[in-house]
Amino acid sequence: MAPVSIVSRAAMRAAAAPARAVRALTTSTALQGSSSSTFESPFKGESKAAKVPDFGKYMSKAPPSTNMLFSYFMVGTMGAITAAGAKSTIQEFLKNMSASADVLAMAKVEVDLNAIPEGKNVIIKWRGKPVFIRHRTPAEIEEANKVNVATLRDPETDADRVKKPEWLVMLGVCTHLGCVPIGEAGDYGGWFCPCHGSHYDISGRIRKGPAPLNLEIPLYEFPEEGKLVIG
């Protein structure tokens, strides 16, 4: 009887297996049905593709050439405004930097010639530079006029360098490298530059040495007898 019982139980389990499978399928279907949420998604039924906003109504209807002309106009206008502002700024800067009337007045120096004896040199300061004033003797004037201008490095007659023969007025700056020459010295009885050995005659003309030019003549005038104004 034991073998029969074992066979019977096996047959019963085999017969019950389909029923369990049906119950499991039914249970799974029920769970799936009940798992849906009661919350309804606002996107339900919407297409998964994102919609791009249409800004066409905000775009200019003018042709491209018109837009470019407008851009050029704006750039040109801004450039003109900038240039006008820069011009005004530069003009104001230059105005502030220009010398005042007081400064210009100080640029002129007045000299009393009665205080300078004949045959003597006087050195004054004008615009930060030394000015040589020589009260020449008749012999010095004659010597200056005897020089052959054609032999000079920087040809100038004595008459071209003075307004009155007895008064020689010139900047005391060597035309070589800017040193101050020594008066009544050198091989020509005029001025000698100790820096590099330039010799100037009694008219201030270069005669020997490395200097290329004669001593410079500043602006000056004789407003009245016995008075000299430089500048």
Swiss-Prot record:
Annotated membrane topology: Single-pass membrane protein
Mitochondrial matrix side: 33-65
Gene3D superfamilies linked to this entry: Rieske [2Fe-2S] iron-sulphur domain, Ubiquinol cytochrome reductase, transmembrane domain
Span of the transit peptide along the chain: 1-24
Processing after translation: Processed by both the mitochondrial processing peptidase (MPP) and the mitochondrial intermediate protease (MIP). Initially, MPP removes 25 amino acids from the newly imported precursor in the mitochondrial matrix. This proteolytic processing is then followed by a second proteolytic cleavage by MIP, which removes an octapeptide to generate mature-sized Rieske protein.
Function: Component of the ubiquinol-cytochrome c oxidoreductase, a multisubunit transmembrane complex that is part of the mitochondrial electron transport chain which drives oxidative phosphorylation.
Similarity section: Belongs to the Rieske iron-sulfur protein family.
Name used for this protein in its record: Cytochrome b-c1 complex subunit Rieske, mitochondrial
Source organism (scientific name): Neurospora crassa (strain ATCC 24698 / 74-OR23-1A / CBS 708.71 / DSM 1257 / FGSC 987)
